[in-house]
């Protein structure tokens, strides 16, 4: 694989992340009846560049009592994992067409927990540690439902390859037959990416800023980039799983445009939810998963396992 292929994937993601921060501030601004950033450049379009320059030229401070290696390694690992999650995403062709693309995404998003845990522990601050423990418990819990929902979708798809979902959804989007799963999936992705109303890791009133409270300048920017890259990736995955774009081999650009539009709409929904809903209480967050989502997803998964045998049908194979 050539280096140019990897760069062609990474650079657009980082640019998208930069402008997503601007979009979020604009949307929140308009929802709160104010303008949002509008000074730097026309309509505030250069604001992300100004933010990046400011963050990366500041001195990265490190607490004297922190663990130097882990403290530096955690943000690097977070961004590396966030970018590697994009490898099997078909847009319409993935960087590497993995046979078990879905399992790769699950495994990589599970590894992201370590970067949060390391950053909280290495900071040697009680606020950071409590924030990290909350984030880890939340991420691991919601990964359970994500895995079961993915298993149900793969039963319908007949394969663990993400590219096959395009073929499966040629005639009908999977959101129509699987709408309960789609709703639970969307709420679980909000919790998985630590977004409002599940942003308990960043409870300003209790934890100052959560697991990244001791970070400043460059390392903080890396965490920030990782979080937003994960948001876009999760929405792209939602679009692929439930709103499959039609792929015409003669015009692959149409598929890409279609996918980008759907991802953008879903990302706007994330921001809309942030502007509209207050934060959950921690026990409510856990009850929602273990007492509501888990039994329901397990029941639906058992139904999807038994349906082909019951109705003597077979899942669509390539």
UniProtKB/Swiss-Prot annotation:
Family matches, as InterPro entries: NADH_UbQ_OxRdtase_su1/FPO, NADH_UbQ_OxRdtase_su1_CS
Which EC class heads this enzyme's classification?
translocase
Keywords tagged on the record: Electron transport, Membrane, Mitochondrion, Mitochondrion inner membrane, NAD, Respiratory chain, Translocase, Transmembrane, Transmembrane helix, Transport, Ubiquinone
Q: Which BP terms in the Gene Ontology apply to this protein?
A: aerobic respiration
Q: Where in the cell is it found?
A: Mitochondrion inner membrane
Does the keyword section mention Transport?
A: yes
GO CC terms for this protein?
mitochondrial inner membrane
Q: Where, by residue number, does the polypeptide cross the bilayer?
A: 3-23, 37-57, 69-89, 100-120, 135-155, 171-191, 223-243, 253-273, 293-313
Membrane topology is: Multi-pass membrane protein
Spell out the Pfam families in the cross-references.
Answer: NADHdh
Entry's Gene Ontology molecular function annotations? NADH dehydrogenase (ubiquinone) activity
This enzyme's EC code(s): 7.1.1.2
Recorded catalytic activity of this chain's protein: a ubiquinone + NADH + 5 H(+)(in) = a ubiquinol + NAD(+) + 4 H(+)(out)
Q: What does this protein do?
A: Core subunit of the mitochondrial membrane respiratory chain NADH dehydrogenase (Complex I) that is believed to belong to the minimal assembly required for catalysis. Complex I functions in the transfer of electrons from NADH to the respiratory chain. The immediate electron acceptor for the enzyme is believed to be ubiquinone.
Membership in a protein family: Belongs to the complex I subunit 1 family.
Q: What is this protein called?
A: NADH-ubiquinone oxidoreductase chain 1
């Amino acid at each position: 694989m050539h280096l140019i292929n990897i760069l062609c994937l990474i650079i657009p993601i980082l640019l998208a992340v930069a402008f997503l921060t601007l979009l979020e501030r604009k949307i929140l601004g308009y929802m709160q009846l104010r303008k949002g950033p509008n000074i730097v450049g026309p309509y505030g379009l250069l604001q992300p560049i100004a933010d990046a320059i400011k963050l990366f030229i500041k001195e990265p401070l490190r607490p004297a009592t922190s663990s130097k290696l882990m403290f530096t390694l955690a943000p690097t690992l977070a961004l590396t994992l966030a970018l590697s999650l994009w490898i099997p995403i078909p847009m319409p062709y993935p960087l590497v067409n993995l046979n078990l693309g879905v399992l790769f995404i699950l495994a990589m998003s599970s590894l992201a927990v370590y970067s949060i845990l390391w950053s909280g522990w290495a900071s040697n601050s009680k606020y950071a540690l409590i924030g990290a423990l909350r984030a880890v418990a939340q991420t691991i819990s919601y990964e359970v439902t994500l895995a079961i929902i993915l298993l149900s979708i793969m039963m319908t798809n007949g394969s663990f390859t993400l590219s096959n979902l395009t073929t499966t959804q040629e005639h009908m989007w999977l959101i129509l037959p699987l709408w309960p799963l789609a709703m639970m999936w969307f709420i679980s992705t909000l919790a998985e990416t630590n977004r409002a109303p599940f942003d308990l890791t960043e409870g300003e009133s209790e934890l100052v800023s959560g697991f990244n409270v001791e970070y400043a300048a460059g390392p903080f920017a890396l965490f920030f980039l990782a979080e937003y890259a994960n948001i876009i990736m999760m929405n792209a995955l939602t679009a692929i799983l439930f709103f499959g774009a039609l792929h015409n081999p003669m015009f692959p650009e149409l598929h890409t445009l279609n996918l980008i539009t759907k991802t953008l709409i879903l990302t706007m929904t994330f921001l809309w939810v942030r502007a509209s809903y207050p934060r959950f209480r921690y026990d409510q967050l856990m009850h929602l998963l273990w007492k509501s989502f888990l039994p329901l997803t397990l029941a639906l998964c058992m139904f999807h396992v038994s349906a082909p045998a019951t109705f003597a049908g077979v899942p669509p194979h390539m």
